[in-house]
Amino acid sequence: MKESRNLENFVEKKLYECKKKYVDIPKDEGQRYGGKHYEALTSKIFEILRKENPELDIIIAEFSLEGSVGMLKIAKPNEFDLVFKLKFPYYKSIAVTRDPKIPGNVLLDMTRVLELLKDDPREDFQRIRELIQGRLVDAQNFFVVDRLRSWLQSLFSQALNRISYRVELVAGVVSHLKYRTCGPAHTIYVYGDYEYSVDYVPAICLAAEQNVLPTKQLECFKRANTSYWEAIPKPLKPLTETSMISFRSSFYAVEKILLQDVHENCRNAIRFMKKFRDVKTNLGNCKSYYIKTLFLWKIIQEPESYWLNPLSFILADMFDDLAENLRRGVITFFWDPELNMIDALTRDQVWEMYLCVQRIPRDLRGAEISRNKWSFFVLREFSHKKERNVNLKCSSRRKRNVIKGLKTTSICKLRNARTNGTWTAGLWTRPGHAYRGPSETVSTWDTVKDAAWSEGIVE
């Protein structure tokens, strides 16, 4: 029992050491990217957008930074997702229905909104009516995903052309910008002394009473006590009868509250799994939201005390969940269990992710791993090699010299201690003499590797 507790404490210590070095955002990086420059860029872009288009100025309600720097972001914060909410006049009169063809999506009928706007004498509201009717809805008054996307794309392009795709947000430092669209996002890439990207994602604001949630999810929504949710204009493939007018339901504010209301071990585990995903080249198809979704399900399935377990226990359990979901080829959308979020991936893509993840729970539990190996396991799985090299301030030559010394010293000591000049495991040795034969034992070389791994100098 005591040995088990000591191992548990050792594992926790190594995880938190790794977290501090490779998972947490360094304070200077958070200020550099998540602070003044990022805020100044967003203020500048939307100042121009509002000025160039009075209609957009009326309907933009607020901004929210998803996966905020202090909560779920990891390491160097150079990618951001910012949701800007579009609140149309009389938005509570939008007729919201579940998309019968696409789980997790809704249809937005603007008929009643247009009627109310038509009877409203205010000039700015008349311009909004003309915008909706002329550019954003189809003949049946349903909001069209691609029309909203095209309208916003033209506005972003105009705004960036206005400043020649460059800004000086810090005195004497010019940043160059590039713009593209991908899915629902309007992405701006920043180059120069400050390098990062921002996905600006539009979201149509809807009232709490307009939700179309199943019973269990509705309970979560009510518990969070939020007054709104959003519909995201996410283009869909393949095309269906409704895909052009189908918007993805989004409950980011509710998700944020659910994650904040449990112990920080939950959020730390999410960040570790995201770091693991970033380190592994064959997990490119594992989106951050898939990981977040697994934790949302866990929150409603387990008592609050679950999150008081050691971080190593939670991580192993959540990697088990991820592996099992990938094995079955299903990650269920939290807000509509009928939607399999990885359904669009091929079987080979899903299986590749499964093979990468399936061994991790066993290794995290560390039952058959020496402490030295476990130390390196944590480094290897939750940090990039380049990060480790920088942290160790260790040159390639120094690595080779240290490894060479470890091999010579460890083999000599091990052989002399074990064999004393006798025939062992098919290898003849003499006292004080080291010779590596073709039948060198695995345990000998494992011992050498353990010593190097414990120093974090060799993989």
Curated annotation (Swiss-Prot):
A single Gene Ontology CC term: cytosol
The UniProt-reported impact of residue 267 to E is:
Abolished binding to nucleic acid activator, leading to impaired antiviral immunity
Q: How is its activity regulated?
A: The enzyme activity is specifically activated by some nucleic acid.
Residues recorded as binding ATP, renumbered to this chain, are 68, 79-81, 252-255, 274, 288-292
Tell me the outcome of changing residue 256 to E: Abolished binding to nucleic acid activator, leading to impaired antiviral immunity
Name the UniProt key words of this record, in alphabetical order: Antiviral defense, ATP-binding, GTP-binding, Immunity, Innate immunity, Magnesium, Manganese, Metal-binding, Nucleotide-binding, Nucleotidyltransferase, RNA-binding, Transferase, Zinc
Q: Which co-factors does it depend on?
A: Mg(2+); Mn(2+)
- Biological processes, Gene Ontology terms: cellular response to virus; cGAS/STING signaling pathway; defense response to virus; immune response involved in response to exogenous dsRNA; innate immune response
Query: Source organism's superkingdom?
Result: Eukaryota
Return the similarity comment. Answer: Belongs to the mab-21 family.
Q: What is this protein called?
A: Cyclic GMP-AMP synthase-like receptor 2
Q: What organism does the record attribute this protein to?
A: Drosophila melanogaster (Fruit fly)
Instruction: Name the gene.
Output: cGlr2
